[in-house]
Amino acid sequence: MAHESVWFSHPRNFGKGSRQCRVCSSHSGLIRKYDLNICRQCFRERASDIGFNKFR
């Protein structure tokens, strides 16, 4: 059994490893609310393009 076939052999159907940012493919800091699935860094860059407004 080669190393490549063992490395990602565990199914990732749930948990943090199953979800990633749709922009940069990062697993950390995901915003899942409203089915955004964008990490917080990418959200700050693209929030106004998506339609979010900052009140303050």
UniProtKB/Swiss-Prot annotation:
Its cofactor is Zn(2+). One of its GO terms (cellular component) is cytosolic small ribosomal subunit. Keywords: Metal-binding, Ribonucleoprotein, Ribosomal protein, Zinc. Pfam families: Ribosomal_S14 (PF00253). Disulfide bonds: none annotated. This is Small ribosomal subunit protein uS14. Binds 1 zinc ion per subunit. InterPro entries: Ribosomal_uS14, Ribosomal_uS14_CS, RIbosomal_uS14_euk_arc, Ribosomal_uS14_sf. It comes from Debaryomyces hansenii (strain ATCC 36239 / CBS 767 / BCRC 21394 / JCM 1990 / NBRC 0083 / IGC 2968). Belongs to the universal ribosomal protein uS14 family. One of its GO terms (molecular function) is zinc ion binding. Zn(2+) binds at C21, C24, C39, C42. GO terms for biological process: cytoplasmic translation. The gene is RPS29.
